Amino acid sequence: LIRSNANVTYIALTNLSEENLIYTPERISKLNVIKIMDIIYYKKKEYPKSLDFLLSSKNISLIKIGLKIRAFYNHRADTDQILQLLYHPSESVQTEVLKTINKLLLVEAEDKLLEIITSHSKKFQINCYRCLANIGTIKTTNFISDTIHVIKDVDIQLSAIYCIEQLNPIQAEQLASTNFELQKMLKHVKTVWK
């Protein structure tokens, strides 16, 4: 606790540069992430360009803070750098990337998400479908229609049904009419997930 508060204090007292943030610990509590975000906001009222290095850091905590900063300031420049982080080995970074894509409404991420969704963990797939529910197009609805029957996990199927229902309720109804289990899932999504 003392060490983490000392790190936050150090960040508050120094300028926000790569040299000063390099000693940030690999794991930071959510509370300290909020404190760091507050410090950055109070020091810089607009997007701090000097913090672009965070997304290319080796430190997972700094990458996640960099993504949160991008989302907070609605900074959409260099989206390729954000999308490349979908391939980061840390699942927590991948999850933060999905949150950032969702908050920034990066529709250009749709193709990449559809390309990689099935090769990732259950948690990633669920979060990915929730993200696609906001940024997806007909490509996403067609992808779900084509793949829903091969998805074995019920939670992932529910997320896919939620996604298609958000994007195109008519297509969701048509898809659900092909299978009793999908009908039940669609009904569940409409009543419980709303």
Predicted feature locations:
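Amphipathic alpha-helical scaffolding segments comprising HEAT/armadillo-like alpha-solenoid repeats
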Residues: 1, 14-27, 44-56, 75-87, ...
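Alpha-helix N-cap/helix-start positions at coil->helix boundaries
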Residues: 3, 7, 29-34, 45, ...
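Generic cytosolic/nucleocytoplasmic N-terminal low-complexity/intrinsically disordered segments
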Residues: 4, 34, 42, 102, ...
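Alpha-solenoid HEAT/ARM repeat scaffold
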Residues: 7-11, 30-37, 64-65, 80, ...
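Core register positions within helices of long alpha-helical scaffolds
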Residues: 9-15, 38-42, 69-72, 100-103, ...
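Alpha-helical adaptor scaffolds
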Residues: 91, 95-99, 103, 107-118, ...
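Ankyrin-repeat and related helical/solenoid repeat scaffolds used for protein-protein interactions
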Residues: 122-166
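Terminal, low-structured helical/coil segments at or just beyond the last alpha-helical repeat
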Residues: 176-194
